[in-house]
Amino acid sequence: MSKIKDILSIELENDIKNVIDLNSQNEEDIKEELDGFILTESLAKHLSDFLDVFCSDMKESGVWLSGFYGSGKSYFAKMIGFLIANPVIKGTSMRDRFMPKLIGLKNKEILENQIRSLDKTDYQVTLFDCAKVDSSYGLSYMAMSHFLLSLGFLSNWIGMMEFNLMLENKYDKFLATVKEQNAGKDWHDIRKKMSAVSALKKAILTFMAEDEYEETRKLIDEKIKTYDATKLKDDLMLYLELYPEKKIVFFIDEVSEALSQKKINLLDLEGLSEALSSLGNRVWTVQLFFERKVRISKK
């Protein structure tokens, strides 16, 4: 006689996470969370509705995702985020790993076509929980600092320096110079240590005068302290000019909690939404709120 565990597609022995953290994005966590995710008919309908709007040509590019405490909105949003980003996990793309979850659904073919339509565009996806991250410089810098992380940079002034080098098409030269100056050590290993600042400066001084470096460092520090939605929009525009085939997507979790903690305010949200909406559908924001029932709607 078959046992229940023999007919289920999930492993009953696996631990179930009480909380899904959008800030946790290592490969093992993503695989574990995807393996445990169950796409019900209701969630499949929400996913289809979202993708229908997201893949359209509409200019509005903001989405609310709301639900009661424990409804799984963070879990759902994280799965959508990684479907869009489509990272390779243990040798297999996220979208390919997700497809078996469609088996048995009423709208399987429609949903599969919608997911495959994501292949037409290259997305840069940023996910973060705004109630758990440093809010010293406001919501806009929260978004920018995590955008830097999504690019593989640091989230501080060094990351902004890396970003500027990328915009000037000097980042590859910088990486090669660091390796040459540090006995073959990679910058991504060096920057984890206290010696990162000196290694950064030494490499940059090979193609920039010292006074120019110091002035750039000063300007970046001031920029971060006064970072706002307009600066975020300008930085994202520069990135999109460099990569015209890309679209940017922000998933911002626990907005209600961050508001209640006074880490952000409604003016922050309004400013961010207005600034990014001026970029059309090249920059999307998906904001997660606490409410009594789950719904997805256009902002």
Pin down the residues of each PLM region.
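Sensor-1/coupling segment of RecA-like P-loop NTPase cores
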Residues: E257, A275-K298
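Conserved alpha-helical scaffold flanking the Walker A/P-loop in AAA+ ATPase domains
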Residues: K108-L118, T230-P244
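Substrate-engagement module of ASCE P-loop NTPases
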Residues: L232-L242, D268-W284
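Long, low-complexity, polar/charged, intrinsically disordered or flexibly structured peripheral segments
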Residues: A183-L232
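Walker A/P-loop-proximal flanking segment of P-loop NTPase domains
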Residues: M1-S71, A77-K78, F82-I84, D96, ...
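Conserved P-loop NTPase "ATPase switch" module shared by AAA+ and STAND
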Residues: L240-K263
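Flexible beta-alpha connector loops of hexameric P-loop NTPases
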Residues: A131-S135, I220-T226, S256-N265
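P-loop NTPase motor core
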Residues: L34-F37, V63-F68, Y75-S195
